[in-house]
A protein has these predicted regions:
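Ala/Thr-enriched low-complexity intrinsically disordered regions
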Residues: 2-5
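Basic polycationic patches enriched in arginine
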Residues: 7-10
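N-terminal Rossmann-like or analogous alpha/beta NTP/dinucleotide-binding catalytic cores
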Residues: 13-130
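Structured secondary-structure scaffolds
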Residues: 14-59, 111-115, 165-228
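Short, solvent-exposed loop/turn and secondary-structure capping segments
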Residues: 32, 69-70, 149-151, 225-227
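Short clusters of hydrophobic/aromatic residues that line enzyme substrate/ligand-binding pockets
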Residues: 68, 139, 146, 158, ...
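Short secondary-structure capping/junction motifs at helix and strand boundaries
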Residues: 97-106, 124-137, 149-151, 166-167, ...
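Cys/His-rich short segments
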Residues: 126-180
Length: 228
């Protein structure tokens, strides 16, 4: 009887379910794509709550970056004023759509800044960050350096990359290539980590990195970010 009671107790313990969305970029106002993602996440959160599971649904905004800085300059206002305005539009839309998120994250939040700085400091202390100079082509729209993989058959960068400029600068890099093998093994061995399962190959290809990740920008080019 005692064993049966314990099994019954374990069976009614609610399952924890965590849902997070992309954090929306605040260089411009929300559009249908933003709403589509949040509504899907909200449906998922409500469904798991109906099943009696404990849900934490997190969404938010990315308020830093070169595009935000450039947009604010064009409008003649500060980046903070610009992101405050755009963030207000996102929040108003989620309220109108009845999005039932439990948490809200913004990259200008002091808690977020402190967390990022702590993580980067720990990674640096563990030898996972290093500085190097790099010369290459940079997409202003996507805020990333491009490689030959991003060129089309004619050797050009497609319109999806927007303005592409050639840059040479020193930045901090994360040793992402050190982690490729264990990430691939984790995805391959986990039966329910990627759903639907037919997307597993796509995920494995996406994490098959052949270069480390650039994680910083020089202050001379970008002043609106988290200092490291």
């Amino acid at each position: 009887m005692t064993l049966l009671a314990k099994r019954q107790e374990r069976s009614i313990v609610p399952r924890m379910y965590y849902i997070t969305t992309a954090i929306d970029y605040t260089n411009g106002p929300p559009h249908i794509g933003h709403a589509y993602e949040k509504v899907l996440a909200d449906v998922l959160a409500r469904w798991h709550r109906m099943k009696g599971e404990e849900v934490y649904f997190l969404t938010g905004v990315d308020q830093h970056g070169q595009k935000v800085q450039q947009t604010a300059e064009k409008l003649g206002i500060t980046p903070q004023e610009h992101v405050n305005n755009i963030t207000g539009q996102f929040l108003a839309l989620w309220d109108r759509l009845g999005i039932s998120n439990d948490g809200w994250a913004s990259t200008t939040d002091p808690r977020h800044k402190a967390c990022v700085q702590k993580i980067l400091t720990d990674l640096k202390d563990k030898g996972q960050l290093y500085k190097k100079s790099y010369k290459g082509f940079y997409s202003v729209r996507q805020e990333q350096f491009l490689t030959d993989k991003e060129r089309d058959a004619e050797g050009n960068f497609g319109p999806e990359w927007g303005e592409v400029v050639e840059l040479e600068e020193e930045n901090w890099y994360f040793r992402l290539t050190d982690h490729v093998e264990w990430m691939k093994q984790f995805v391959e061995k986990s039966s329910d980590f990627v759903l639907p399962s037919f997307r597993k190959t796509e995920v494995l290809n996406a994490i098959d990195f052949d270069s480390d990740l650039c994680i910083s920008r020089p202050k001379s080019r970008l002043s609106w970010g988290i200092e490291f």
